Amino acid sequence: KIPAIIDPNGPDGAPIGLFESGAILLYLAEKTGKLIGSNNADKAQITQWLMFQMGGLGPMFGQLGFFYKFAGAEIEDTRPKERYINEAKRLLAVVDKQLEGKDWIAGDYSIADIAIAPWLRALDFYGAREVTGWDNHKNAVAYLDRFLERPAVQKGLATPARPA
């Protein structure tokens, strides 16, 4: 299962293996005390938005990509594509509203942003910015730009070419 990690220095000094991006993000944030907020209220908000991505944004945007970019021409029934376009629009509006007056989804930069922003970026890969009304969501557009300007994000996106 990907993504997965093995932390040789897990809880109580024993190795631990984890899969699922949300579980990995939460584990690493709690272990390091970084990107998880400075109090229980912050942590609750960050966790809420992490779960929003895990249970809504990620699955729905993933299905949008499948039906809009990859399988759309092969499937005569237009209802799946329409459903995921509409759901992506709705979820994008939720993100945009949450970002009003904020730089990051839950206040300070956090694991919630690490989970959410890449799915917004995926709309470009899917060729679905226009159909989802991306340009009408100014807060989300500015948010993704801020995310992509972060040095760690740039480093992560600079993957080496695969050998031929």
Model-derived regions: residue spans:
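Active-site-flanking alpha-helical
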Residues: 29, 119-120, 157
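Surface-exposed helix-capping loop/turn segments at secondary-structure junctions
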Residues: 34, 97-108, 151-156
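GST superfamily/GST-like fold recognition
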Residues: 56, 60-65, 104-129, 136, ...
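Terminal-tail/helix-coil boundary detector
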Residues: 155-164
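Residue-level signal for nonpolar/aromatic packing positions in well-ordered secondary structure
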Residues: 5, 24, 95, 113, ...
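GST-like domain detector, emphasizing the conserved glutathione-binding G-site
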Residues: 1-82, 86, 96, 105
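Structural helix-adjacent loops and short alpha-helical linkers that scaffold large soluble proteins
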Residues: 42, 83, 129-137
